[in-house]
Every structure is written in C-alpha cells, then in structure tokens.
Amino acid sequence: MGRLFGTDGVRGLANEKLTAPLAMRLGAAAARVLTEKKSTDRRPTAIIGRDPRVSGEMLTAALSAGLASQGVDVLDVGVLPTPAVAFLTDDYGSDMGVMVSASHNPMPDNGIKFFAIGGRKLEDWIEDEIEQEMGKLPEEGPTGAAIGRVFDQSHSALDRYLHHLQQAVHTRLDGIKVVVDCAHGAAYQAAPMAYEAAGAEVVAVSNKPNGYNINDGVGSTHIDQLQKAVVEHGADLGLAHDGDADRCLAVDAQGNVVDGDQIMAVLALSMKDGGELKRNTLVATVMSNLGLKLAMERNGITLRQTQVGDRYVVEDLRAGDYSLGGEQSGHIVIPEHGTTGDGLLTGLFLMARMATTGKTLAELASAMQVLPQTLINVPVSNKAAIAGDARVKQAIAKAEEELGETGRVLLRPSGTEELFRVMVEAADSATARKIAGQLAAVVAEV
C-alpha cells in the first residue's frame, strides 16, 4: 500500500477508500502523535469541522470517536470553511484541528486534513508518524473519566470566525455589489455574512447545500455560472469559492475571469504600496503564469516559486518570513491573518483594494498580462511511471525546443487524484493548445 497522505491530507471515495473504520484509526493515531508532546496537564482538545457533503457526518463521527478514545475532548464546529477550522484551532488554544472535506472534488469523494497546534498544516514527517502509529494502535485506551467527550461548538464558532475576518480587513465596502458563488459548500453561510458585514451588497448563489450538490456545476471549478450571474445582476465583481472555501477566484464586471495569479498581483502591489510586502517578495508555485513573474519584475517585486500545493507555499512563507503567497487556483495565504489559504479573507482584501483605489477589478487586474496557458488533466493508472518514461521525456524535449524562450512546459502528477497534469504556456493560444494536446496524447499512451 502506498502513502496514505497526499498533498492535502487523505482523500478518496467515501466509504470505499475513505471508510469510517479508517477515519476512526486516523483520529486515534493523530491524537497520539499530535498530543504526545503536550506541555500541560490540561486534557487535550481537538477542533473538528466539515463541509456539507453527505459523508461528512459519518466521517466526523468516526474521527471524533477515534480522538475521544485517546482521551481528547472534541469541539465540533459543524459546517465551516477549512481556514475557519485552522483559525479556531489557534483561537481556542486547541492541540490539533481536523477538517473533513474533499475541497473541490465531486460529492462522492471526501477527505481528512489535520492541523497542528496553532492551526498549522502538518509537515510530511508528522504525517508519516501518524501513518506509522496507525499500525501499532493498542487495543485498549483510557477508561472512565479519562475518555474524551464531544462538544457542539457550531454556533459560537461561526461568530468567532466572522469576528476574525472583520478584525483583519477594516476597509468598508459600501457601494460595491458582489455576487458570491458558495459552491453549495462550507462557506454557504460565512461568505455572504462576511461580505455583508463589511458593507457590500451581496447576491449569494449556490448557497443551498443539501449534502449532494456540493461543487455540482458550481463554485470555483465551474466559474461560467458566476460569469453569467455577474453580468445579469450588474455587479461590480463576482467571487467563487470551492467546497471548503480555502480558495477564491474572481470575475470582473464584464464577466472576465480573474484567477489566483492576477489576484496575487493585485494584492502584492497593494501591500507594496502600503509598505506591508516583506522584502518585496511574493511566493507562488511553478504552476503560476509566466505573466505573474514579468509583472512582479516590472514593479520591483521578487517572485519565489515552490512545488505545487499551498502547504509548500506556506512553508516557504514561514521560512522566509514573507507576507503573501498563493496559487493560480486561488489559494491565497496572508500569514499575518491566517495559517492557510482563506477564500473569504482573499475576497475581502480584493474588494478593499477596489474600495481604496476607486478602480474596477478589470483595471486592477490589468497590472498583469496573462500569457496563454493550456492545462490538460490526463487520467492515468500509474502516475509514478510517467515522469521516467522515455517517450514522455522525448516529447517534452521536442516541445521545449519548439517553444524556446517564448513559453514553458510543466508536467506533474496530481497529489489528490489519479491524474497527470500537462501545462503549456506559449505566445499564443493555438500553440499552447497544440503542444499541450501532443504531450497529453503521449502521457495517455504510457
């Protein structure tokens, strides 16, 4: 069996790969690993939250049982965004946090991600320790009063998270009309409430989760619905979140998509103007458009690039004490206000920049020229075999020779799905599509 943890926790088809017994063992093992170095005699606590997909309640119950079996008190915060769970882990002073969500994945999938004390995502070696602990769990645990309990904190938790957002962004948004697509996900309450509290006129769509409709043709991975809604409602912008609301993409008043790279460009320039961009540095990943690097260079900002995954962006932000980072997909991290990507916080800061400058989103986003980019997700059965395949290497070399200095090629495995991602940037869309298609065809044959 391969490594259980992927790039963003444990994910899989609920009740097949990700079962209740597995979740209970994960909870017990995580409790033992993440609370073993606790410095006080206080009973350890864990925050647990989820998105609204149908399997969430089952997995939350199983995880809670595993945690309580090892003497951990569980504070169940209900349906809340992933960044809220990270924040509350720190705000409550808990020893760990758990989010049950498969983010942007389809409803049948689910996932489990853990946060360490302070709301930080786990490093690889800690995840390895949890996996090892799963194989040696004792049959018996604490008894009597030492067994953990489960407490419902859902009502107060939402209020605490909303207060946190209000404290982070002070700029009033009066006069701004925004359509927010909640993806029938974890932000269905929090996002409209946060934006309204800041003064914006809010039109909420895809905000009626029923357990089955999360990410179903809506949200940040299906942004065409938001594009139409923004134009229909005559809004100044639209904001699209995914199932767990750790990402945010935007749409300008004309219905044009403003992706995570462009949002980072807007926020980086805003923070630089305010003297808040530490060492004039922005942290992104290798998937970011070449246009972001060029835009930052024009404005005296250094762009650092990590491997794909917001956890690696966060690690680089922490190591270098930088103040802004993120991904093209819309995971934006502002360490002063959170330990992980926060779609709601991103939306608030983006609208605050519009309010303070008086500029439209289209005007702000024009600071970066997006080079044509084609991304093809190729279903594969053996991700490990692709990178070393001679045919793939030959195809990459040919593509890079054809592109020269006018573009780039990037092939990488998905960390959460059985896919291999083929990305090509070029001077024009036709060339990017052609070369990406050629590479994808080779990958599919392996």
UniProtKB/Swiss-Prot annotation:
It catalyses: alpha-D-glucosamine 1-phosphate = D-glucosamine 6-phosphate. The keyword Amino-acid biosynthesis does not apply. It comes from the Bacteria. GO terms for cellular component: cytosol. Gene3D superfamilies: Alpha-D-Glucose-1,6-Bisphosphate, subunit A, domain 3, Alpha-D-phosphohexomutase, C-terminal domain. InterPro entries: A-D-PHexomutase_a/b/a-I (IPR005844), A-D-PHexomutase_a/b/a-I/II/III (IPR016055), A-D-PHexomutase_a/b/a-II (IPR005845), A-D-PHexomutase_a/b/a-III (IPR005846), A-D-PHexomutase_C (IPR005843), A-D-PHexomutase_C_sf (IPR036900), A-D-PHexomutase_CS (IPR016066), Alpha-D-phosphohexomutase_SF (IPR005841). Keywords: Isomerase, Magnesium, Metal-binding, Phosphoprotein. The modification Phosphoserine is found at S103. Its cofactor is Mg(2+). Binds 1 Mg(2+) ion per subunit. Pfam families: PGM_PMM_I, PGM_PMM_II, PGM_PMM_III, PGM_PMM_IV. Coiled coil: none annotated. Activated by phosphorylation. HAMAP family: GlmM_B. Catalyzes the conversion of glucosamine-6-phosphate to glucosamine-1-phosphate. This is Phosphoglucosamine mutase. The lineage of its organism: Bacteria, Bacillati, Actinomycetota, Actinomycetes, Mycobacteriales.
